[in-house]
C-alpha cells in the first residue's frame, strides 16, 4: 500500500505548482473510493495531458467544523491499520480534514493546543484536502477514458462489419476477374489464330471450326443462309474479275517499275562516279591547300622568328645602352660625391638647397614607376619569346626528323645509283686497262733496239768529274771577263755533257713499281673524271657526305649551325672519338694493317708528286742556267761540235720511247696550275732558238738578258702534260734543232746528276741551289697536287693565285751586280736564288699558308682517288 500511495502521489498532475480541483461528484464515498482506486490505476499508464477540458483553480477551503471527539474515540487505529480498513478512513476523512482545532482546549488544564502540533495537524489537513482533490480529478479522467473506450469499441464493431462486407465484395470481384481473364485469353487465342475461328455472318457468335458454324447456321439461320449463298457467289465472281484486272495492272506496273529501277540505277552509278571524281579533285585541292598553308605557316614562322630576333636584339642593345648610361650616371654621381667642396654653415646649406625638392621626388617616383613598368614588359616579352621559341623548336625538330627521313630515302636511292655507276666504271676501267696493256706492248718494242751511245767513255767520265763553273754577271768588268773567257767553253761543254753524255740505263724495279702505281693512279683519275663529268652525281655525293658528316657531328654532340666549340667540349669529343676508334680496333682484327696501308699509299702519292715537281724544277733550272751563264760569244772546235751533235741525237733517240710511254699511259693529263704560263710560249721558243744558235754555229753569240725570278717561277711549275707534249714535239722536229732537244733531258737523269755534286764543289757560305729548288717544289707540289679537284677545293686555288701574284711581284727585279773578285762571283752563283730579308719572310708566310691549304687538298685528293 505504501508503494502504491507513493506512486499515486508521484503521478499527481501539478501545473506550475498550482492544482485545479474538480467539483465533487454526486457519488457516495464508496463510489469515490472505487473511482480513486481506478483513477490511481489509470494514472499510472495515462499521461497528465490526457485530461480534456480546462482545469479549475484549486484553493484550500476554510476550517469551520468542530471535532467529533466521540467518533474519533470510537475508532481503533491499530485495527484499521492491521485490516487496512479504507472505508473507516473514508467515513471520517471529511471531519478530520475540515475540522477547526485552534479553539480546542484541554479539558483538564484548559490550555490551548501546542502551536507545533497545531501546525502539523494543519499540514496534514491540507495534504488530505489535496489528495481528495486529486482523487476527484482522477475519477473524472477515468470516466472520460471509459467513454472513449466505449466509443472505440463501437468503432471496432463497425469496422468488423465493414471488413466482412468488403471481403464478400472482393470474393465476387475475384470470380468476375477470373471469368474475364479466361474470356480475354480465349479472345487472344482466336485473334492469334485468325483463321481458326469462324464468325457467324448473321450474329455476333464465333466458332472454333467450320462444322460448328454450319450447324449453327442450319439451326439458327436457315432462311437467311440461302439468300447469303446467292450473294456470296455473286460477290465471288465479281472479285475474280477484279483480281484478273488487278493482275494485269500489276504486271504492267511491275514492268514500268523495273524500267524505272534500271534507269535510276544507271543514273545513280553516273552520279556516284561524278561524286567520286569530285571528291578526288577536292582531296587534291585540299592536299595542295594544306601544303600551301604549311609553306605559308613556315614562312610566317620564319618571319615571326626573325622579327622576334630583331626585337630581342634591339631590346638587348637598348638594355646595354641603358646599362651603359646607368653606369655613366653612377660614375658621375661618384665623381659629384667625391668632388664636394668646403664645408658650409647650416644657414648657408639651407640657402643653397634646391627650391624644388618636391619636383625632384616626383621625378624619382615617375622614373621608378617607368622602370617597374618596363621591367614588367620586358619580363612579359621574355616569357612570350620563350614560349614562341619552344614552339618553334618543337616544330623545327619535327621538320628536321621529316627531312632526315627524306634524306635517308634519297641516300638509299643515290647509293643504289652509285653502285650501278661503279659497276659500269669498273667495266670501263677493265676495258681501259686492256687497251693500256696493248699500248704498253707497242711502246716497249723500241726499247730493245736502242744501241749504246757513241763516243769515248773516258771523255764522259772527264766531263762528269769536272765541276760546273759559276755564272758570270752581265755588268762585270772586262778584266774579269778576259780571265773567265778561257774557262767558259769548258764550262758549257761540261754542262751539256752532263745533259747529253749520260748513258741510258734500263728501268729499275722501283721505276717499274712506280709505273704500276701510275697505272692505278690513272685508273683512279679516270674515276674522278667520270664523277666530274656527271655533275648531278657529284652534287648528290656531296650532299650525302655533308649529311653523313652532320649526323656524325650530331652524334658527337655538335650541332651543324655552331661556329665554334670550347676546349672542354673538344676534349670530350676527342675522347669519344678515341674510344670509338679503339672499339673499331677491337672489332676489326687487321685495323692497323689497313691504316698503315692507307698511310703508305698517301705518302707514296705525295712523294711521287714531289718527285715530279722536283724533276720539272731541275729541267727548268738547267734551262735557266744554260741561258743565263753564257755572257759572251763561244767558239767551239769542230770536233767538239760534231761530238755534241752526235751525242745529242743519240740521247734524244734513246729518251723518246720512255717519254712517249708516259704520255700514252696518261690518257687524262693533269690541268696546268693557274700560276704557270701556257706551254710552248713565244718567249720559250725564242730562248730555245737562241740556245741552238749558240751551240750549233761557230759565230758570235749575243748574251741574253738574265732570267729574273718571275720567269723562273713560270718555268719551274710546269705540269706533266707540258713536259710530255714538249718531248713529243721536240722529237718530231729533231733535225733543225738537235742541241735544243738535248737540253731537256729526262727528269730522272737530272735527279741523278745532283746528288754526287751536292757536297763536292759547294763553296763556304753558299747555298745548294738544286736542293733548295727541290724543297720549294715540294711545297708547291702540295699546293698544286689537286688542281684538277676544283669542285672539291676552291680555297687552295685562290691562295695559289694570290701566292703566284705575290711571288711574281717580288721576283721582277734582277739581282744587283757587284764589282768583286772571282770568289765573290762564285758566292753569287751559288746564292743566286737565295731570297733576302723581307723576301725570305714573305716566302715563309707563303709556305705556311700553302701548307695550311694543302692539308685540305691532300685529304680531298685521297678521298676522291679512293672513290
UniProtKB/Swiss-Prot annotation:
Molecular-function annotations in GO: BBSome binding; molecular adaptor activity; zinc ion binding
Region described as Mediates interaction with GLI3 and localization to the cilium basal body: spans on this chain: 12-367
Annotated region (Required for interaction with DAZ1), positions in chain: 154-278
InterPro entries xrefs: DZIP1_N, DZIP_RILPL, Znf_C2H2_type
Reported modifications of this chain: Phosphorylation at Ser-226 by PLK1 before mitosis prevents interaction with PCM1 and localization to centriolar satellites. Thereby, it negatively regulates the localization of the BBSome to centriolar satellites.
UniProt xrefs under Gene3D superfamilies: Classic Zinc Finger
Phosphoserine modifications at: 226
Residues in the signal sequence: none
Any Gene Ontology biological process: establishment of localization in cell
Recorded family membership: Belongs to the DZIP C2H2-type zinc-finger protein family.
PANTHER family xref list: CILIUM ASSEMBLY PROTEIN DZIP1, ZINC FINGER PROTEIN DZIP1
Role noted for this protein: Molecular adapter that recruits protein complexes required for cilium assembly and function to the cilium basal body. At the exit of mitosis, localizes to the basal body and ciliary base of the forming primary cilium where it recruits and activates RAB8A to direct vesicle-mediated transport of proteins to the cilium. Also recruits the BBSome, a complex involved in cilium biogenesis, by bridging it to PCM1 at the centriolar satellites of the cilium.
The protein's name in its UniProt record: Cilium assembly protein DZIP1
Name of encoding gene: DZIP1
Amino acid at each position: 500500500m505504501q508503494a502504491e500511495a507513493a506512486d499515486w502521489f508521484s503521478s499527481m498532475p501539478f501545473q506550475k505548482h498550482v492544482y485545479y480541483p474538480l467539483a465533487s461528484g454526486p457519488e457516495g464515498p464508496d463510489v469515490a473510493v472505487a473511482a480513486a482506486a481506478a483513477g490511481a490505476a489509470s494514472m499510472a499508464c495515462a499521461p497528465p495531458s490526457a485530461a480534456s477540458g480546462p482545469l479549475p483553480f484549486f484553493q484550500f477551503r476554510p476550517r469551520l467544523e468542530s471535532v467529533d471527539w466521540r467518533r474519533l474515540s470510537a475508532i481503533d487505529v491499530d485495527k484499521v491499520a492491521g485490516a487496512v480498513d479504507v472505508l473507516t478512513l473514508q467515513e471520517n476523512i471529511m471531519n478530520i480534514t475540515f475540522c477547526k482545532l485552534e479553539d480546542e482546549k484541554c479539558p483538564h488544564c484548559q490550555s490551548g493546543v501546542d502551536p507545533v502540533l497545531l501546525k502539523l495537524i494543519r499540514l496534514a489537513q491540507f495534504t488530505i484536502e489535496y489528495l481528495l482533490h486529486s482523487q476527484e480529478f482522477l475519477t473524472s479522467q477515468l470516466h472520460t477514458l471509459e467513454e472513449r473506450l466505449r466509443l472505440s469499441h463501437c468503432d471496432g464493431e463497425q469496422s468488423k462489419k465493414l471488413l466482412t462486407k468488403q471481403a464478400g465484395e472482393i470474393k465476387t470481384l475475384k470470380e468476375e476477374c477470373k471469368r474475364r481473364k479466361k474470356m480475354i485469353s480465349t479472345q487472344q487465342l482466336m485473334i492469334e489464330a485468325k483463321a481458326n475461328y469462324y464468325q457467324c455472318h448473321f450474329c455476333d457468335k464465333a466458332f472454333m471450326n467450320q462444322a460448328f458454324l454450319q450447324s449453327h447456321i442450319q439451326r439458327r439461320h436457315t432462311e437467311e443462309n440461302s439468300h447469303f449463298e446467292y450473294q456470296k457467289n455473286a460477290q465471288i465472281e465479281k472479285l475474280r474479275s477484279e483480281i484478273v484486272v488487278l493482275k494485269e495492272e500489276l504486271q504492267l506496273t511491275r514492268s514500268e517499275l523495273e524500267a524505272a529501277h534500271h534507269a535510276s540505277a544507271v543514273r545513280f552509278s553516273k552520279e556516284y562516279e561524278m561524286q567520286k571524281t569530285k571528291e578526288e579533285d577536292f582531296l587534291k585541292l585540299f592536299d595542295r591547300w594544306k601544303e600551301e598553308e604549311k609553306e605559308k605557316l613556315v614562312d610566317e614562322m620564319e618571319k615571326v622568328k626573325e622579327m622576334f630576333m630583331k626585337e630581342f636584339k634591339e631590346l638587348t642593345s637598348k638594355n646595354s645602352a641603358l646599362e651603359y648610361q646607368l653606369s655613366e650616371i653612377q660614375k658621375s654621381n661618384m665623381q659629384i660625391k667625391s668632388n664636394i667642396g668646403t664645408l658650409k654653415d647650416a644657414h648657408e646649406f639651407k640657402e643653397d638647397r634646391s627650391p624644388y625638392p618636391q619636383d625632384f621626388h616626383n621625378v624619382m617616383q615617375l622614373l621608378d614607376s617607368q622602370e617597374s613598368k618596363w621591367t614588367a614588359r620586358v619580363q612579359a616579352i621574355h616569357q612570350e619569346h620563350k614560349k614562341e621559341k619552344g614552339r618553334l623548336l618543337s616544330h623545327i625538330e619535327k621538320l628536321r626528323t621529316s627531312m632526315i627521313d627524306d634524306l635517308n630515302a634519297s641516300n638509299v636511292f643515290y647509293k643504289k645509283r652509285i653502285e650501278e655507276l661503279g659497276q659500269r666504271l669498273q667495266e670501263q676501267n677493265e676495258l681501259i686497262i686492256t687497251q693500256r696493256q696493248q699500248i704498253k706492248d707497242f711502246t716497249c718494242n723500241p726499247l730493245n733496239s736502242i744501241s749504246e751511245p757513241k763516243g769515248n767513255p773516258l771523255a764522259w767520265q772527264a766531263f762528269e768529274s769536272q765541276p760546273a763553273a759559276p755564272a758570270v754577271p752581265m755588268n762585270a768588268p772586262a778584266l774579269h771577263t778576259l780571265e773567265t773567257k778561257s774557262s767558259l767553253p769548258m764550262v758549257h761543254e761540261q754542262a751539256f755533257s752532263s745533259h747529253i753524255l749520260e748513258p741510258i740505263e734500263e728501268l729499275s724495279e722501283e721505276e717499274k713499281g712506280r709505273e704500276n702505281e701510275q697505272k692505278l693512279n690513272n685508273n683512279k683519275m679516270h674515276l674522278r673524271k667520270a664523277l666530274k663529268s656527271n655533275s648531278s652525281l657529284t652534287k648528290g655525293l656531296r650532299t650525302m657526305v655533308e649529311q653523313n658528316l652532320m649526323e656524325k657531328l650530331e652524334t658527337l654532340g655538335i650541332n651543324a649551325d655552331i661556329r665554334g666549340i670550347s676546349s672542354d667540349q673538344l676534349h670530350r669529343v676527342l675522347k669519344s672519338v678515341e674510344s670509338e676508334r679503339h672499339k673499331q680496333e677491337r672489332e676489326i682484327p687487321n685495323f692497323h694493317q689497313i691504316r698503315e696501308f692507307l698511310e703508305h699509299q698517301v705518302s707514296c702519292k705525295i712523294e711521287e708528286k714531289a718527285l715530279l715537281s722536283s724533276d720539272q724544277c731541275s729541267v727548268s733550272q738547267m734551262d735557266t742556267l744554260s741561258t743565263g751563264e753564257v755572257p759572251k760569244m763561244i767558239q767551239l772546235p769542230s770536233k767538239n761540235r760534231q761530238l755534241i751533235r752526235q751525242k745529242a741525237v743519240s740521247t734524244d733517240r734513246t729518251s723518246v720511247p720512255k717519254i712517249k710511254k708516259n704520255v700514252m699511259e696518261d690518257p687524262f693529263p693533269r690541268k696546268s696550275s693557274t700560276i704557270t704560263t701556257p706551254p710552248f710560249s713565244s718567249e720559250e721558243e725564242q730562248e730555245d732558238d737562241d740556245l741552238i744558235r749558240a751551240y750549233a754555229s761557230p759565230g758570235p753569240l749575243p748574251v741574253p738578258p738574265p732570267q729574273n725570278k718571275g720567269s723562273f717561277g713560270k718555268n719551274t711549275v710546269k705540269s706533266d702534260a707540258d713536259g710530255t707534249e714538249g718531248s713529243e714535239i721536240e722529237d718530231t722536229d729533231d733535225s733543225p734543232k738537235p742541241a735544243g732537244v738535248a737540253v731537256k733531258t729526262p727528269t730522272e737523269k737530272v735527279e741523278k746528276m745532283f746528288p754526287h755534286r751536292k757536297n763536292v764543289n759547294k763553296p763556304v757560305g753558299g747555298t745548294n741551289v738544286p736542293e733548295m729548288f727541290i724543297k720549294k717544289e715540294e711545297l708547291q707540289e702540295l699546293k698544286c697536287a689537286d688542281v684538277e679537284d676544283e669542285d672539291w677545293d676552291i680555297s687552295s686555288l685562290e691562295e695559289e693565285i694570290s701566292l703566284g701574284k705575290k711571288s711574281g711581284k717580288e721576283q721582277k727585279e734582277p739581282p744587283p751586280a757587284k764589282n768583286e773578285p772571282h770568289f765573290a762571283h762564285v758566292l753569287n752563283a751559288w746564292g743566286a736564288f737565295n731570297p733576302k730579308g723581307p723576301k725570305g719572310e714573305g716566302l715563309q708566310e707563303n709556305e705556311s699558308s700553302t701548307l695550311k691549304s694543302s692539308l685540305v687538298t691532300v685529304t680531298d685528293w685521297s678521298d676522291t682517288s679512293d672513290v
